[in-house]
């Protein structure tokens, strides 16, 4: 659990590598915009169990894996919100084809609302870090200014 984004959204960061292994292998190779399944272990009174999918909001250029979610009153989200630093989480994936296009002569136009901005955070951070020659145009709708997520990333484009 890293920080609160907006009003009811939390971002969770996890180590990208298993430092206990001799080769320090990367545990998840993904493309900006993809999602993965996160298993947080025992969740009581939740018929859906301990596995949920989340868009990876971090960029592959960052040294951590991050996902962001609205914290609601479900058993899963309650358990997620009290995870201790260093907690083990199983990850399966990545999956999905909602990624930045490769034709940089055409602008990338993003439309998002609220928590739907998460794949764009990943793509914008990646494009910025890699200095890709792509023009990014973003339209992001929120209830008010306090609910804008990832303000620093959005200001850069």
Where are these regions (language model features)?
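FNR/FR-type flavoprotein reductase catalytic core
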Residues: 72-157
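Ferredoxin-reductase
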Residues: 1-87, 142-144
């Amino acid at each position: 659990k890293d920080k609160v984004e907006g009003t009811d959204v939390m971002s969770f960061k996890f180590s990208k590598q298993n430092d206990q292994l001799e080769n320090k292998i990367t545990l998840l190779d993904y493309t900006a915009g993809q999602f993965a399944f996160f298993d947080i272990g025992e969740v009581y009174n939740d018929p859906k169990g301990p596995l949920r999918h989340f868009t990876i909001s971090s960029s592959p250029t960052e040294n951590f894996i991050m996902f962001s979610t609205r914290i609601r009153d479900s058993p899963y989200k309650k358990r997620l919100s009290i995870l201790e630093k260093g907690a083990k989480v199983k990850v399966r994936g990545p999956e999905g084809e909602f990624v930045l296009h490769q034709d940089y002569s055409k602008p990338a136009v993003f439309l998002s609302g609220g928590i739907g901005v998460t794949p764009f955070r990943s793509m914008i951070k990646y494009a910025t870090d890699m200095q890709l020659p792509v023009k990014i145009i973003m339209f992001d709708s929120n209830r008010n200014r306090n609910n804008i997520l990832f303000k620093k990333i959005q200001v850069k484009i």
